[in-house]
UniProtKB/Swiss-Prot annotation:
EC number from the UniProt entry: 1.1.1.195
Cofactor binding: number and manner: Binds 2 Zn(2+) ions per subunit.
Binding residues for Zn(2+) 1: 47, 69-70, 163
Chain's role: Involved in lignin biosynthesis. Catalyzes the final step specific for the production of lignin monomers. Catalyzes the NADPH-dependent reduction of coniferaldehyde, 5-hydroxyconiferaldehyde, sinapaldehyde, 4-coumaraldehyde and caffeyl aldehyde to their respective alcohols.
Catalytic activity: (E)-cinnamyl alcohol + NADP(+) = (E)-cinnamaldehyde + NADPH + H(+); (E)-coniferol + NADP(+) = (E)-coniferaldehyde + NADPH + H(+); (E)-sinapyl alcohol + NADP(+) = (E)-sinapaldehyde + NADPH + H(+); (E)-4-coumaroyl alcohol + NADP(+) = (E)-4-coumaraldehyde + NADPH + H(+)
Chain residues that bind NADP(+): 49, 167, 188-193, 211-216, 251, 275, 298-300
Name by which UniProt lists this protein: Probable cinnamyl alcohol dehydrogenase
Example GO molecular function: cinnamyl-alcohol dehydrogenase activity
BP term (GO), one: lignin biosynthetic process
Organism: Pinus radiata (Monterey pine)
């Protein structure tokens, strides 16, 4: 996409090495193409995978790196061929900003599974420039990978839906886990897990939160609306709950045993893995074959599903529980996130941090 546009200089917060420490970084946006929009960032959520990328835990990180893939902002400029958006509209950008558009996955509106997908940051654009994320004052994004924020959805509330929200919404729709009255377990109560509780309840499911301790029980039941709470270390209660759940959404992003949770599934039950776990996970096959249970995986969602997630949450008045912080607090927020010291998602007030002043 050639363009006569000049490059725009912006400021963001970048990691320079695997220490993951973020500090101010000035760089040029790629030139705006005919199908691009320029988005002034207002809010950006913090995801656990940001920590993974910043610290090179997957061995694929490149620096300087500006993280952030739960981006909410306002369109300030549009390319000559942009039909989807107008200047002044509130929009969102999630985990990917490009794909090949010609493979089987792309042709079926499953861009997130395209082998040539382009990550929102720590990747390379089609023109060879590095992608940088939402911890910055502005971004240039292809209109195909931008979604519209519903007018009745608060902007700061929309940010976590662009990753955490669609991560649970997509498998629930794909695997038909939306029948009212069915019993759904949510394993792990962090940023993704708390959205799982809220979205599952909005679909009319009976929701059981499964956690390693009872620290979050009162909040899960009284604030998030869960119907039941199960402590995974309570062997007696886990045995009593055997074969009681139709589905489990496993949101835990670190290595953990699967056997205790597979035992909770009914015959034909399904455990869907949502967390990025770099270490091997182990289980014994009789837990699967003697109950025709299955383990599946799901990765974020398509652009269509992302828009559907936003519209669904706006209609059902599903809100995320967030703590809004400034960019000057970003490193402390990352440290707290690593310790699970957040209820339940940090959202950075990027515009309020006045990066370009």
């Amino acid at each position: 996409m050639g363009s006569l546009e000049t490059e725009k200089t912006v400021t963001g917060y970048a990691a320079r090495d695997s220490s993951g420490h973020l500090s101010p970084y000035t760089y040029n946006l790629r030139k705006k193409g005919p199908e691009d929009v320029i988005v002034k960032v207002i809010y950006c959520g913090i995801c656990h995978s940001d920590l993974v990328q910043m610290r090179n835990e997957m061995g694929m990180s490149h620096y300087p790196m500006v993280p952030g893939h739960e981006v909410v902002g306002i369109v300030t400029e549009i390319g000559s061929e942009v039909k989807k958006f107008k200047v002044g509209e509130h929009v969102g950008v999630g985990c990917i900003v490009g794909s090949c558009r010609s493979c089987g996955n792309c042709n079926q509106s499953m861009e997130q599974y395209c082998s040539k997908r382009i990550w929102t940051y720590n990747d390379v654009n089609h023109d060879g420039t590095p992608t940088q994320g939402g911890f910055a004052s502005s971004m240039v994004v292809d209109q195909m990978f931008v979604v519209r924020i519903p007018e009745n959805l608060p902007l700061e509330q929309a940010a976590p839906l662009l990753c955490a929200g669609v991560t649970v919404f997509s498998p629930m729709k794909h695997f038909a886990m939306t029948e009212p009255g069915k019993k759904c377990g949510i394993l792990g109560l962090g940023g993704v897990g708390h959205m799982g509780v809220k979205i599952a309840k909005a679909f009319g499911l009976h929701v059981t939160v499964i956690s390693s301790s009872d620290k979050k029980k009162e909040e899960a039941m009284e604030v998030l609306g869960a119907d039941a709470y199960l402590v995974s270390k309570d062997t007696e209660k886990m045995m009593e709950a055997a074969e009681s759940l139709d589905y489990i959404m496993d949101t835990i992003p670190v290595a953990h045993p699967l056997e205790p949770y597979l035992a909770l599934l009914k015959t034909n039950g399904k455990l869907v893995m949502l967390g990025v776990v770099p270490e091997p996970l182990h289980f014994v096959t009789p837990l699967l074959i003697l109950g025709r249970r299955s383990i599946a995986g799901s990765f974020i969602g398509s652009m269509e599903e992302t828009q559907e997630t936003l519209d669904f949450c706006a209609e059902k008045k599903v809100s995320s529980m967030i703590e809004v912080v400034g960019l000057d607090y970003i490193n402390t927020a990352m440290e707290r996130l690593e310790k699970n010291d957040v209820r339940y998602r940090f959202v950075v007030d990027v515009a309020g941090s006045k990066l370009d002043n």
